[in-house]
Structures are given as C-alpha cells and as structure tokens.
C-alpha cells in the first residue's frame, strides 16, 4: 500500500506542470537529435512521431501502459514497460538511445518523460494524445 501511495504521489507531482502549463508547446517544431549538450524532452504529434520513427532507426519505442491496455493495440516495434513498474523502481528505461514514450492519452508518458529527462536521459519524446491520438490519425497498430 505504501508503494502504491508513493507511486500515486509521484504521478501527481509529475502531472502538475501539465495542469498548470501555459498551453505553449514545442509540437510545431521538427524533432532534432540531442547533440550531447542538454537533455531533449519534446512532445510530438502522431504524424511527427511517425516521421521520427521512420527517420531514426535507433529510436526505442516504450509503451508505459498496463498489459491490460495492450488489447487496444500498440505501435509496431514498441516494447511494454508499464508505468507502475517504473514508478515503483522495478524497471527502468533503456539508456544510450533516443526514446519515444507512449501511453493511452499522453499523461503518463509525459510524466515519465519529465522524470527521466530530469535524471539526465539524453533524448526523450512523448506522443501527444497517446495511442488514442495515434489511432485517430489512422496510423498503424498491431494487436498483441
């Protein structure tokens, strides 16, 4: 129960900037690779994310939804690392390669991206609107 409360507290803390943001985002700028200077954390629209997937063969697609949510479909090539596992420290994100984070509607992946970007992960992208927006854009899904 204590770990659950800690995970919920972490989620609330990380989602606060979303609720309090000014609405400005970097969604209209094209993605740029990290030059090793400062960590990159950007939110991308589904078409931008698809273009990044096609352009960056070293990109790791990380789906932070729960295993039960995969029945809705997943982006081909994505790997499941559930948010709950990350929040409880039982799993971590891959290092040394750029990451595209995916969840149901973009909130959990944004929180994970903010957290790991603050930990020094170099290049992290968040899928705006999550798998719901990806699906609404008519982009390919796979069933697991």
Which stretches of residues belong to each language-model region?
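Short, surface-exposed ligand- or partner-binding patches at beta-edge/loop junctions that are enriched
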Residues: 102
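Rhodanese-like catalytic fold shared by cysteine-dependent sulfurtransferases
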Residues: 2-9, 13-58, 67-98, 107-144
